[in-house]
């Protein structure tokens, strides 16, 4: 178990089984974590795989980011890559994603109550969730959606801004 650490890695690969708080700066690196409390990262040209995490925050370029289960929050900025979170748990408070040329895929618990704001330019939204829309605007190259899932008075939130990428929200039972 690593309680807290700063990891600097270039042209590498490594695995961490269990950790509390990690700060990661990596380039051209494949990083894999099994269970994490908190990760803050800057990662270019690589792969970051996390099985289970509470809080995730970071920035990547040409990064493939795959998360198994998210329990609390994520704040992500990615260009030219993939962001995939297989399971967003009902206790998650916030997800904020800003992406360019990046595919975004979120598997969301059907019990997660959240407000959503999704702003797309040259991008698309596909959702199998029963989202309620208060605002829904579609222009030739821009799309904007604002509303909620299950409870319009919740404080939980999902904010996605995407340019030149697809956004896919699926119900994950």
Regions found by a protein language model. Name each.
Residues 1-173:
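Intrinsically disordered, low-complexity terminal regions
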